[in-house]
């Protein structure tokens, strides 16, 4: 919503480039874009909604742990789903799914029916996404910038800085803990 407001306020176009993985919420945020480009190795799509949890009651019983919950209503505690709670959550999931589908239909100028044919939760390769109208072009990032420069007649771009990803952060921290030599192991 904020990206759409930005476009309306500034009258500036938004072009999106998917470098690696832009699925589910990552795909949804692209719907405000005027053009969507993707690297040939990009995975995208995953148009759908999921809610999950664990029923740990069997494990708790084996371990002798008793779970106690005091609530203000019968549907407040969802540690052990009842059929009624499952129905409540399914309604919420269905509502969120319809909203997601409508956002994609609006963003990609497709009919809701056409989006629903693609919106079963699966991911798509860049080629599949392009063939299905989920993205506009497959290219390398510099090629997208060149196309944008030619189309818009400018070489001034505002690019979002990418924060270090969680996995990258974890791996770099783990790597820093690994000894670099036998001497480090012994000290």
Please annotate each region the language model reported.
Residues 43:
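Short glycine/proline-centered loop/turn elements that form peptide/ligand docking sites
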